[in-house]
């Protein structure tokens, strides 16, 4: 007999009847929260957009505020974004937003003169522009148009063209190509101003010899058009990257100067990973070998006499991993001290935990600043006397984030947790945003209670004001039956598996509930976090009576290198095993109906859910894979090779072949499988699901599939509503049908 559980309606003390969440609530974003990130423009001033869409400048010390850009000015060009020049004389207004890939987009830009209240005429900007930004000082601006970089000394001046070789899908100047945007830089730009705006550094990516992925975009025309993207897959030829620097004061007199690549990196294929200006005369570049277990940090100085950038070998700092790849998901970036020589950086200590180190002359002589069986996550700011960072050290929960201040002006350095005891029940997961010189900062709390954003004095840490506390959301949720959440851990064979379990509102341990595993599981990811969310799985628990579980297994982040690097060169093994192990432990808890267990995931999670379903354990009745990777030979070089090595006979080809979903097609025979993908997925190509479908058909295995035409990896717009409605029906059918 199959019992489908529904949470009962309860009576609260105020006399009103609470209701369960509905799918419509989720699809409409009824219970979404707000955060407040100040747009800092000085040590004590920030900009923000009001409810009326006016751009307000607020001075913390005087308490004064005024409109710097009116909503009528914004509306006159249908602007959706803005940027104030550092001298406060001009603002750019951004309109005609057109999304490209994850971070990149094109837009139209209008320059508004704040002194006379008029738009700048003459030498207007071309359209559409791929990227635009002000210099850090004054009102110079640089922009990228048709893959070339242009400089304006003033908004009304004619542009100076810095590069001439830009070409669509071939040469990218000042913006990354697809693979660098997605897998290395995680930005839409690849140019960086020096602190005072004297120099401009930029990257050039040459994709001329890169294989192209081509897919159809159906649109509304009689014939589909073909989208072509240079996309290096595992083992394929990579883009060639070069870094140039130009003096923007007299760009026509001295052209761009190339920055040399360290010899130990340049001897074979390599990556550029990031660039940090130390001051106007010193720059720091980070490079990676293609195998990504060796990173070189190179500090270069400008030689005025020769007009070159000198990068001595003595200023090369090497970071190497012998058990995995260098860094976490990315190699960490340095934060330089005021002496413009020494810096702070996060990397693994001798015990295999990622901690803050102070480097003055070499990495070998680095001084470890933090230590323990936890990890430093991010260095926010270094001032003359303080270092602010985030970590998960407090009370031993890896899925929490607190902000700490270390006094570096005294010896021994003293440490203070700024956030550990602020609204402790409500707030256990923070990030921060600092003004110049850390004079003030905003704390943004993401949960587990309702998110709240607050403003603080950078000298005393005292709270000055609440910026956003989500009062409207709090009132709206008073009449809603939210599920309960628990974060706990399983200890299995010396492996710690942290999990979050979401329980129906009227949960009763003496009853049996269907279980849905939501998995991502990719290297360096973390799903079990102390954050607030009202989402699809909240609805499934609140209304449909399901228990939902998220498990962080081997390969996930912020618990030390032993767990993180366990999956190195063998993706698709331990991530799957740990989900299966957790399910068996959940069954032992006594309240899971072992005949009604499902698993679902998106992207890497779709890969893991597919392999779990095809594991032959008999644990799962059904499952869903959205936009899954099906073979690592089909995915991007930078990501795949970081974790798997190369698909060659003399390296790791055997595991590439053994880790495919297609190799397990026969094992889907005894599960209900729903396969979902967008046909215009630029990230995990539709090819992945097409190959799964072909293998299942060849094995004569029945399955369900849903394709979303012209949709990318995110399945947005109306497709989102259809997707979650369809998956809900699939799970309800799975859990209601008898064997």
Report each predicted region and the residues it spans:
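Beta-propeller folds
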Residues: 1-440, 446-451, 528-529
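Serine-hydrolase catalytic core recognition
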Residues: 211-212, 272-274, 288, 417-739
């Amino acid at each position: 007999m199959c019992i489908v559980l529904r949470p009962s309606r309860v009576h609260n003390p105020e006399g009103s009847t609470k209701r369960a969440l509905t799918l419509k609530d989720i699809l409409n974003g009824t219970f979404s929260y707000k955060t407040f990130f100040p747009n800092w423009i000085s040590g004590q001033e920030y900009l923000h957009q009001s409810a009326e869409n006016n751009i307000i400048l607020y001075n913390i010390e005087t308490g004064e505020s005024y409109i710097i850009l009116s909503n009528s000015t914004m509306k006159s060009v249908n602007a959706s974004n803005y940027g104030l020049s550092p001298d406060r004389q001009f603002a750019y207004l951004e309109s005609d937003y057109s999304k490209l890939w994850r971070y990149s987009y094109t837009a139209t830009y209008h320059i508004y003169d704040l002194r006379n209240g008029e738009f700048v005429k003459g030498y207007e900007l071309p359209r559409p522009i791929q990227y635009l930004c002000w210099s850090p000082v004054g009102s110079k601006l640089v922009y990228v148009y048709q893959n070339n970089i242009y400089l304006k000394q003033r908004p009304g001046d004619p542009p100076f063209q810095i590069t001439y070789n830009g070409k669509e899908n071939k040469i990218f100047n000042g913006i990354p190509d697809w693979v660098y945007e997605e897998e290395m830089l995680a930005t839409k730009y690849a140019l960086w101003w020096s602190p005072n705006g004297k120099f401009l550094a930029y990257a050039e990516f040459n994709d001329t010899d890169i294989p192209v992925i081509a897919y159809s975009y159906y649109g509304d025309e009689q014939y589909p058009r073909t989208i072509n993207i240079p996309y290096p897959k595992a083992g394929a030829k990579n883009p060639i990257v070069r870094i140039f620097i130009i003096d923007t004061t007299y760009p026509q007199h001295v052209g761009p100067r190339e920055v040399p690549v360290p010899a130990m990196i340049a001897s074979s294929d390599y990556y550029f990973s990031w660039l940090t200006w130390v001051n106007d005369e010193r720059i720091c570049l980070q490079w990676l070998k293609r195998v990504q277990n060796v990173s070189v940090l190179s500090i270069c100085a400008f030689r005025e006499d020769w007009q070159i950038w000198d990068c001595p070998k003595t200023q090369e700092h090497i970071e190497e991993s012998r058990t995995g790849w260098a860094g976490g998901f990315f190699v960490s970036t340095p934060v330089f001290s005021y002496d413009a020589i020494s810096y702070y950086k996060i990397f693994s200590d001798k015990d295999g935990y990622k901690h803050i180190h102070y480097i003055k002359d070499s990495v070998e002589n680095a001084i470890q600043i933090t230590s323990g069986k936890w990890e430093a996550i991010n260095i926010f700011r270094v001032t003359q006397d303080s270092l602010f960072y985030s970590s998960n050290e407090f009370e031993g929960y890896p899925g929490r984030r607190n902000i700490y201040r270390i006094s570096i002006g005294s010896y021994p350095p003293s440490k203070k947790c700024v956030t550990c005891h602020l609204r402790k029940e409500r707030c256990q997961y923070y990030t921060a945003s600092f003004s110049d010189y850390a004079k003030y900062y905003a704390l943004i709390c993401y949960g587990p209670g309702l998110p709240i954003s607050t403003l603080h004095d950078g000298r005393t840490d005292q709270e000055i004001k609440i910026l956003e506390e989500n009062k409207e959301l709090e009132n709206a949720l008073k009449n809603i039956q939210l599920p309960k959440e628990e974060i706990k851990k399983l200890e299995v064979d010396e492996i710690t598996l942290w999990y979050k379990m979401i329980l129906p509102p009227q949960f009763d341990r003496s009853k049996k509930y269907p279980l849905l595993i939501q998995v991502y599981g990719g290297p360096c990811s973390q799903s079990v976090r102390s954050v607030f969310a009202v989402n699809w799985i909240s609805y499934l628990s609140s209304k449909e009576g399901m228990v939902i579980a998220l498990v962080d297994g081997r390969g996930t982040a912020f618990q030390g290198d032993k767990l993180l690097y366990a999956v190195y060169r063998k993706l698709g093994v331990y991530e799957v095993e740990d989900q299966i192990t957790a399910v068996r432990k959940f069954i032992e808890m006594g309240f899971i109906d072992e005949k009604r267990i499902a698993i679902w995931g998106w992207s890497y999670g779709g890969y893991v859910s597919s392999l779990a379903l095809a594991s032959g354990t008999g644990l799962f009745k059904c499952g869903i894979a959205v936009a899954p990777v099906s073979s690592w030979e089909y995915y991007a070089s930078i990501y795949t090779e970081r974790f798997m090595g190369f698909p060659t006979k003399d390296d790791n080809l055997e595991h590439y072949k053994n880790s495919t979903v297609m190799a397990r097609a026969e094992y889907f025979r005894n599960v209900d499988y729903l396969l979902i993908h967008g046909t215009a997925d630029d990230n995990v190509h539709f090819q992945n699901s097409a190959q799964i479908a072909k293998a299942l058909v060849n094995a004569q295995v029945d399955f369900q599939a849903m394709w979303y035409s012209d949709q990318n990896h995110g399945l947005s717009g109306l497709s989102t509503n259809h997707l979650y409605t369809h998956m809900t029906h699939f799970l309800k059918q799975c859990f209601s049908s008898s064997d």
